Amino acid sequence: MNNNHVYDMLVVGGGPGGYTAALYAARAGLDTIVLEKLSAGGQMALTEQIDNYPGFEDGIDGFSLAEKMQKQAERFGVRSEYAEVLRMDLTAVPKLVETSEGIFRGKTVVLATGADPRTLGVAGEAELLGRGVAYCAACDGMFYKGKTVVVVGGGNSAAADALLLSRVAKKVILVHRRDTLRATKIYHEPLSQAENVEFRWNSVVSALLSGDRLTGVRLRDTVTGEESVVDCDGVFVSVGRQPATALAVGQLALDDGGYIVAGETTETSIPGVYAVGDVRTKPLRQVVTAVADGAVAVHMAEKYIAENR
Protein backbone atom coordinates (compact mmCIF):
# COMPACT_ATOMS: atom_id res chain seq x y z
CA MET A 1 0.00 0.00 0.00
CA ASN A 2 1.41 3.37 -0.99
CA ASN A 3 -1.12 6.13 -1.44
CA ASN A 4 -1.47 9.76 -0.51
CA HIS A 5 -4.15 9.28 2.14
CA VAL A 6 -3.23 11.14 5.31
CA TYR A 7 -4.63 9.86 8.60
CA ASP A 8 -5.18 12.17 11.51
CA MET A 9 -3.38 9.67 13.72
CA LEU A 10 -1.07 6.73 13.18
CA VAL A 11 -0.81 4.49 16.23
CA VAL A 12 2.26 2.26 16.19
CA GLY A 13 1.65 -0.69 18.52
CA GLY A 14 -1.58 -2.42 19.50
CA GLY A 15 -1.15 -2.74 23.25
CA PRO A 16 -3.45 -1.20 25.88
CA GLY A 17 -1.95 2.27 25.42
CA GLY A 18 -2.17 2.08 21.65
CA TYR A 19 -5.76 0.88 21.45
CA THR A 20 -6.90 3.33 24.12
CA ALA A 21 -5.37 6.15 22.08
CA ALA A 22 -7.12 4.80 18.99
CA LEU A 23 -10.45 4.57 20.82
CA TYR A 24 -10.25 8.14 22.12
CA ALA A 25 -9.09 9.43 18.74
CA ALA A 26 -11.91 7.76 16.84
CA ARG A 27 -14.50 9.02 19.30
CA ALA A 28 -13.08 12.50 18.79
CA GLY A 29 -13.65 12.16 15.05
CA LEU A 30 -10.01 11.57 14.11
CA ASP A 31 -9.25 9.25 11.20
CA THR A 32 -7.12 6.62 12.95
CA ILE A 33 -5.22 3.45 12.13
CA VAL A 34 -3.34 1.04 14.42
CA LEU A 35 -0.22 -0.60 13.01
CA GLU A 36 0.60 -3.81 14.89
CA LYS A 37 3.23 -6.40 13.99
CA LEU A 38 1.65 -9.50 15.56
CA SER A 39 -1.58 -9.32 17.55
CA ALA A 40 -3.36 -6.94 19.88
CA GLY A 41 -2.28 -6.63 23.48
CA GLY A 42 1.50 -6.59 23.43
CA GLN A 43 2.98 -7.98 26.65
CA MET A 44 -0.46 -7.83 28.26
CA ALA A 45 -1.74 -10.54 25.92
CA LEU A 46 0.81 -12.97 27.38
CA THR A 47 -0.40 -12.45 30.96
CA GLU A 48 -2.37 -15.41 32.25
CA GLN A 49 -4.42 -13.50 34.81
CA ILE A 50 -4.88 -9.76 35.39
CA ASP A 51 -6.46 -8.90 38.73
CA ASN A 52 -5.47 -5.25 39.09
CA TYR A 53 -7.34 -3.74 36.14
CA PRO A 54 -10.58 -2.10 37.35
CA GLY A 55 -13.94 -3.48 36.29
CA PHE A 56 -13.19 -7.21 36.34
CA GLU A 57 -13.98 -8.49 39.83
CA ASP A 58 -12.88 -12.03 38.96
CA GLY A 59 -9.91 -10.87 36.91
CA ILE A 60 -9.38 -11.46 33.21
CA ASP A 61 -6.67 -13.03 31.09
CA GLY A 62 -4.55 -10.64 29.06
CA PHE A 63 -5.53 -12.03 25.66
CA SER A 64 -9.24 -11.55 26.32
CA LEU A 65 -8.72 -8.01 27.61
CA ALA A 66 -6.67 -7.16 24.52
CA GLU A 67 -9.39 -8.55 22.27
CA LYS A 68 -12.02 -6.45 24.04
CA MET A 69 -9.93 -3.29 23.69
CA GLN A 70 -9.39 -3.88 19.99
CA LYS A 71 -13.05 -4.60 19.27
CA GLN A 72 -14.16 -1.55 21.24
CA ALA A 73 -11.85 0.73 19.26
CA GLU A 74 -12.86 -0.80 15.93
CA ARG A 75 -16.53 -0.31 16.80
CA PHE A 76 -15.88 3.43 16.54
CA GLY A 77 -14.16 3.16 13.17
CA VAL A 78 -10.53 2.44 14.04
CA ARG A 79 -8.72 0.46 11.35
CA SER A 80 -6.20 -2.23 12.35
CA GLU A 81 -3.37 -3.16 10.02
CA TYR A 82 -1.05 -6.07 10.80
CA ALA A 83 2.34 -5.01 9.52
CA GLU A 84 5.93 -4.70 10.68
CA VAL A 85 7.20 -1.14 10.89
CA LEU A 86 10.44 -0.81 8.91
CA ARG A 87 11.16 2.91 8.98
CA MET A 88 9.74 6.14 10.36
CA ASP A 89 10.24 9.77 9.34
CA LEU A 90 8.74 11.64 12.25
CA THR A 91 9.79 15.11 11.10
CA ALA A 92 8.20 14.78 7.66
CA VAL A 93 4.98 16.64 6.87
CA PRO A 94 2.86 14.59 7.01
CA LYS A 95 4.68 12.10 9.22
CA LEU A 96 5.61 8.84 7.49
CA VAL A 97 5.66 5.24 8.69
CA GLU A 98 6.91 2.62 6.25
CA THR A 99 5.77 -0.95 6.94
CA SER A 100 5.91 -4.40 5.39
CA GLU A 101 2.45 -3.66 3.99
CA GLY A 102 3.24 -0.23 2.57
CA ILE A 103 3.63 3.40 3.57
CA PHE A 104 1.25 5.21 5.90
CA ARG A 105 1.09 8.95 6.50
CA GLY A 106 -0.39 10.83 9.42
CA LYS A 107 -0.69 14.27 10.94
CA THR A 108 0.27 12.78 14.31
CA VAL A 109 1.93 9.60 15.51
CA VAL A 110 1.41 7.76 18.79
CA LEU A 111 4.23 5.36 19.63
CA ALA A 112 2.99 2.46 21.76
CA THR A 113 5.71 -0.03 20.93
CA GLY A 114 6.24 -1.25 24.50
CA ALA A 115 9.22 -2.74 26.27
CA ASP A 116 10.08 -6.41 26.48
CA PRO A 117 11.45 -7.89 29.70
CA ARG A 118 15.00 -9.15 29.40
CA THR A 119 15.04 -12.90 29.86
CA LEU A 120 17.33 -15.38 31.59
CA GLY A 121 18.03 -17.13 28.31
CA VAL A 122 17.75 -20.63 29.77
CA ALA A 123 15.90 -23.62 28.37
CA GLY A 124 12.19 -23.85 29.15
CA GLU A 125 11.82 -20.21 30.17
CA ALA A 126 9.20 -19.34 27.56
CA GLU A 127 7.28 -22.58 28.14
CA LEU A 128 7.06 -21.91 31.90
CA LEU A 129 5.74 -18.37 31.53
CA GLY A 130 2.65 -18.22 33.75
CA ARG A 131 3.56 -21.60 35.26
CA GLY A 132 6.23 -20.43 37.64
CA VAL A 133 8.17 -17.91 35.56
CA ALA A 134 7.07 -14.28 35.80
CA TYR A 135 8.43 -10.86 34.92
CA CYS A 136 6.16 -8.58 36.96
CA ALA A 137 5.91 -8.87 40.74
CA ALA A 138 3.23 -6.20 40.95
CA CYS A 139 1.12 -8.18 38.46
CA ASP A 140 1.67 -11.75 39.64
CA GLY A 141 2.98 -11.55 43.21
CA MET A 142 -0.32 -12.44 44.87
CA PHE A 143 -0.35 -15.82 43.11
CA TYR A 144 2.61 -16.77 45.33
CA LYS A 145 1.14 -15.93 48.71
CA GLY A 146 2.73 -18.17 51.35
CA LYS A 147 5.12 -19.73 48.84
CA THR A 148 8.84 -19.64 48.12
CA VAL A 149 10.02 -17.47 45.25
CA VAL A 150 13.31 -16.54 43.63
CA VAL A 151 13.99 -13.02 42.37
CA VAL A 152 16.80 -12.71 39.81
CA GLY A 153 18.60 -9.38 39.51
CA GLY A 154 20.44 -6.78 41.51
CA GLY A 155 19.12 -3.41 40.38
CA ASN A 156 16.30 -1.22 41.62
CA SER A 157 13.58 -3.27 39.95
CA ALA A 158 14.84 -6.52 41.49
CA ALA A 159 15.15 -4.93 44.93
CA ALA A 160 11.67 -3.43 44.72
CA ASP A 161 10.25 -6.76 43.54
CA ALA A 162 11.93 -8.62 46.39
CA LEU A 163 10.52 -6.19 48.95
CA LEU A 164 7.04 -6.39 47.47
CA LEU A 165 7.14 -10.19 47.39
CA SER A 166 8.47 -10.37 50.96
CA ARG A 167 5.10 -9.07 52.12
CA VAL A 168 3.18 -11.99 50.58
CA ALA A 169 5.59 -14.88 50.04
CA LYS A 170 6.79 -17.26 52.72
CA LYS A 171 10.38 -16.87 51.55
CA VAL A 172 12.17 -14.71 48.97
CA ILE A 173 15.58 -15.70 47.61
CA LEU A 174 17.34 -12.84 45.81
CA VAL A 175 19.87 -14.14 43.29
CA HIS A 176 22.50 -11.73 41.95
CA ARG A 177 25.56 -12.33 39.80
CA ARG A 178 27.68 -9.92 41.85
CA ASP A 179 28.54 -9.73 45.56
CA THR A 180 26.54 -6.58 46.24
CA LEU A 181 23.35 -4.98 44.95
CA ARG A 182 23.45 -2.33 42.23
CA ALA A 183 20.18 -0.98 43.63
CA THR A 184 20.23 2.42 45.30
CA LYS A 185 20.97 2.53 49.04
CA ILE A 186 17.34 3.18 49.93
CA TYR A 187 16.60 -0.53 49.30
CA HIS A 188 19.53 -2.01 51.22
CA GLU A 189 18.33 -1.60 54.79
CA PRO A 190 14.71 -2.74 54.24
CA LEU A 191 15.95 -5.85 52.43
CA SER A 192 18.52 -6.70 55.09
CA GLN A 193 15.88 -6.31 57.80
CA ALA A 194 13.29 -8.49 56.06
CA GLU A 195 13.41 -11.80 57.92
CA ASN A 196 12.13 -13.83 54.98
CA VAL A 197 14.61 -12.49 52.39
CA GLU A 198 17.72 -14.55 51.68
CA PHE A 199 20.59 -13.53 49.38
CA ARG A 200 22.52 -15.72 46.97
CA TRP A 201 25.50 -13.65 45.87
CA ASN A 202 27.78 -14.37 42.89
CA SER A 203 25.12 -16.65 41.43
CA VAL A 204 23.27 -17.05 38.15
CA VAL A 205 20.38 -19.31 37.14
CA SER A 206 21.79 -22.05 34.93
CA ALA A 207 18.62 -24.15 34.61
CA LEU A 208 14.91 -24.19 35.41
CA LEU A 209 13.57 -27.38 36.99
CA SER A 210 9.99 -28.36 36.30
CA GLY A 211 7.25 -30.89 35.87
CA ASP A 212 3.95 -29.36 34.81
CA ARG A 213 5.09 -26.24 36.67
CA LEU A 214 8.35 -24.81 37.91
CA THR A 215 9.71 -26.76 40.87
CA GLY A 216 13.09 -25.12 41.36
CA VAL A 217 16.20 -23.59 39.85
CA ARG A 218 19.78 -24.65 39.46
CA LEU A 219 22.26 -21.95 40.44
CA ARG A 220 25.88 -21.64 39.34
CA ASP A 221 28.41 -19.80 41.49
CA THR A 222 30.18 -17.27 39.26
CA VAL A 223 33.36 -17.50 41.36
CA THR A 224 33.78 -21.22 42.03
CA GLY A 225 31.64 -22.68 39.25
CA GLU A 226 29.86 -24.92 41.75
CA GLU A 227 26.17 -25.64 41.18
CA SER A 228 23.33 -26.02 43.66
CA VAL A 229 19.57 -26.58 43.49
CA VAL A 230 17.01 -24.29 45.10
CA ASP A 231 13.44 -25.55 45.44
CA CYS A 232 10.90 -22.81 44.75
CA ASP A 233 7.40 -22.19 43.45
CA GLY A 234 8.18 -19.21 41.28
CA VAL A 235 10.96 -17.20 39.64
CA PHE A 236 10.61 -13.47 39.08
CA VAL A 237 13.06 -12.28 36.44
CA SER A 238 13.99 -8.66 37.19
CA VAL A 239 17.02 -8.04 35.02
CA GLY A 240 15.66 -5.02 33.19
CA ARG A 241 13.55 -4.32 30.15
CA GLN A 242 14.39 -3.53 26.55
CA PRO A 243 12.22 -0.75 25.07
CA ALA A 244 11.27 -1.17 21.41
CA THR A 245 12.77 2.12 20.28
CA ALA A 246 15.33 1.11 17.65
CA LEU A 247 13.48 3.01 14.91
CA ALA A 248 13.34 6.14 17.06
CA VAL A 249 17.10 6.37 17.53
CA GLY A 250 18.43 9.55 15.95
CA GLN A 251 14.96 11.08 15.79
CA LEU A 252 13.59 11.26 19.32
CA ALA A 253 15.26 12.03 22.63
CA LEU A 254 15.88 8.80 24.55
CA ASP A 255 17.11 8.28 28.10
CA ASP A 256 20.10 6.12 29.05
CA GLY A 257 17.91 3.02 29.11
CA GLY A 258 16.62 3.63 25.59
CA TYR A 259 13.16 4.79 26.68
CA ILE A 260 11.52 7.70 24.86
CA VAL A 261 11.74 10.88 26.91
CA ALA A 262 8.12 11.94 27.43
CA GLY A 263 6.44 13.27 30.54
CA GLU A 264 2.85 13.07 31.74
CA THR A 265 1.67 14.91 28.61
CA THR A 266 3.21 12.05 26.55
CA GLU A 267 4.77 14.67 24.25
CA THR A 268 8.15 13.72 22.79
CA SER A 269 10.97 15.89 21.46
CA ILE A 270 9.16 16.12 18.09
CA PRO A 271 5.85 18.04 17.99
CA GLY A 272 2.93 15.82 17.01
CA VAL A 273 4.64 12.63 18.17
CA TYR A 274 3.54 11.03 21.45
CA ALA A 275 4.85 8.09 23.47
CA VAL A 276 2.49 5.99 25.58
CA GLY A 277 2.78 2.95 27.81
CA ASP A 278 5.94 1.06 28.67
CA VAL A 279 8.04 2.72 25.93
CA ARG A 280 8.19 6.12 27.64
CA THR A 281 10.03 7.34 30.72
CA LYS A 282 7.76 6.72 33.72
CA PRO A 283 7.90 5.38 37.29
CA LEU A 284 5.25 2.66 36.91
CA ARG A 285 4.59 0.43 33.90
CA GLN A 286 1.18 -1.24 34.21
CA VAL A 287 -1.85 -1.76 31.98
CA VAL A 288 -3.77 0.96 33.79
CA THR A 289 -0.97 3.53 33.36
CA ALA A 290 -0.65 2.70 29.66
CA VAL A 291 -4.39 3.22 29.20
CA ALA A 292 -4.16 6.61 30.91
CA ASP A 293 -1.28 7.59 28.61
CA GLY A 294 -3.37 6.76 25.56
CA ALA A 295 -6.16 9.09 26.60
CA VAL A 296 -3.74 11.93 27.39
CA ALA A 297 -1.94 11.53 24.06
CA VAL A 298 -5.16 12.07 22.12
CA HIS A 299 -6.00 15.14 24.18
CA MET A 300 -2.62 16.62 23.24
CA ALA A 301 -2.87 15.47 19.61
CA GLU A 302 -6.24 17.18 19.16
CA LYS A 303 -4.70 20.46 20.28
CA TYR A 304 -1.74 19.95 17.93
CA ILE A 305 -3.96 19.23 14.93
CA ALA A 306 -6.15 22.27 15.65
CA GLU A 307 -3.09 24.52 15.86
CA ASN A 308 -1.53 23.16 12.65
CA ARG A 309 -4.40 23.14 10.20
Report the location of each language-model feature.
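Beta1-alpha1 glycine-rich phosphate/pyrophosphate-binding loop at the start
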Residues: N3, Y7-F76, A159-T184, D255
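Glycine-rich, N-terminal phosphate-binding loop of Rossmann-like dinucleotide-binding domains
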Residues: G14, T113-G114, V239-G240
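Glycine/Thr-rich phosphate-binding loops of Rossmann-like dinucleotide-binding domains
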Residues: T119-L120, A159-A160, R182, E227, ...
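FAD-site-proximal beta/loop scaffold in flavoenzymes
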Residues: V6, G121, E127-F143, V239-T289, ...
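Glycine/small-residue-rich loop that forms an oxyanion/phosphate-binding "nest" at active or ligand-binding sites
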Residues: S80-F143, G154
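A Rossmann-like FAD-binding core segment of flavoenzymes
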Residues: A73-V93, V97-E98, I103-F104, S166-G263, ...
